[in-house]
Amino acid sequence: GPHLHFEVRATDSQKPLNPLLYGLPVNDRQRPQIQKLILYYPQQNSVLTPSKRLTLQKVNDSTYQTPLIMTSGKIGLGIQMFDRQDLSYNRNGIYQAIMEVNGKKVVNYKFDTLNYSDSDKLFVIVDYPKFKNERYKVVKLFFQNQKPLTFIKSMVNEGMIDIVIGKSYQIKLTLKDFSGNSTHVEMYVEGKKKEIKAKPLDGKLIEPHLEYFFPLDDQDVFIPKNTFFEDAVIEIKKEGNILSIGPNLFPFDNPYEIRFKTNKQDSLQLRQTFIAKKTDKKDYYLPTVLKDGFWVSQVAEMGDYKLARDSVPPEIKAYNFKPEQWLSKFKFLNIKISDDISGIKNYRGTINGKWVLFEYEPKRNLLTYDFSDNDFDLTKHDLRVEVEDNVGNKTIYETVFFRK
């Protein structure tokens, strides 16, 4: 629901700053915790980066080791991790991550300031397939073919380590929180010949600097330049009235466009029709416009899409009162509203013909009016609530209540 965030920002740039830099007292004796350590094999001709999870062996309270790694070629590392403070179970991010190879610093992430322009690019350093398909977040300590983010203080060779056959390497990871608590991982790598095979993907290679148009009878897909951060492979299929686009393995920089050709229908049917994302549970409304004989929607995710229609108006019900009830002792007036197909677009409430503020809580489908907002001279009050869904269907609820 609605809530408030406080931020400390630099006056000149408006960049968010780490508030702990300004002496806020926080009790913290807990070390950052590592949940998973992932070894990646970045390859020149592979769109998807092969990876494997490494076993972590606890040496003491602050140090872990991995078994000896024997491989060759370029490797990178990724970590699933979190940090806690005393007296709190919240899982926070860490303050600093450092990677050293043979005693030399290769990567240094430090979260003392952020840039809002970074927020759209954070999925570049997150293992996107694992996040979308396995629901956990691994932060990669390598960063290919991209402009550095604000919190990347230093990075050598894009954070990748080139393992040469016959040579040995010591890799040390250090995770720190702001209070100085730290956790370490020690790794030893021996250069041995090893062939890493990338998983092949079916579909069309999409290069970020090009645009693509895919016509499919009465459905089209348009992918502008810079839709993806990096090269992607996508497969587009038309299965009956379903437009299927996948796989869900690549992060988006910008949305792309899907189009469904309009049929000869009356104006009401046209207005009530929209593009929906199809899931196992339900069809989800997507903002849709009519353009040049097509229904058009901008999307920034893979999935199955179809045309849907919503001819059912929203529902409105009294929640904590009954019509013609005395409400003199009530502090709030609650109205339940819902629309199971395209969803609520807007609402408006009046009492005795005068607009009043209703606060909307979408998770509970609840409108709430605070009686302390207004004083009324009369005892009989006419309530009117109008709700409109995303395709323009409307419902009006009118009733009377009494209050001194």
Regions found by a protein language model. Name each.
Residues 78-84, 257-263, 332-340:
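Short edge beta-strand/loop segments characteristic of extracellular beta-sandwich folds
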Residues 42-45, 52-193, 340-404:
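Long, low-complexity serine/threonine/glycine- and acidic-rich segments characteristic of extracellular
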Residues 60, 67-72, 250-251, 323-329:
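Short, solvent-exposed loop/linker segments at the N-terminal edge
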Residues 1-43, 48:
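Conserved, short, structured surface segments that act as functional micro-motifs
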Residues 223, 247-305, 346-348, 355-357:
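Proteolytic-maturation and junctional protease-sensitive modules
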Residues 18, 104-109, 241-244, 280-289, ...:
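Surface-exposed loop/edge segments in extracytoplasmic proteins
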Residues 31-36, 313-320:
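Proline-enriched interdomain boundary motifs that mark the N-terminal boundary
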Residues 196-209, 230-274:
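Proteolytic processing hotspots in large secreted/extracellular or virion-associated proteins
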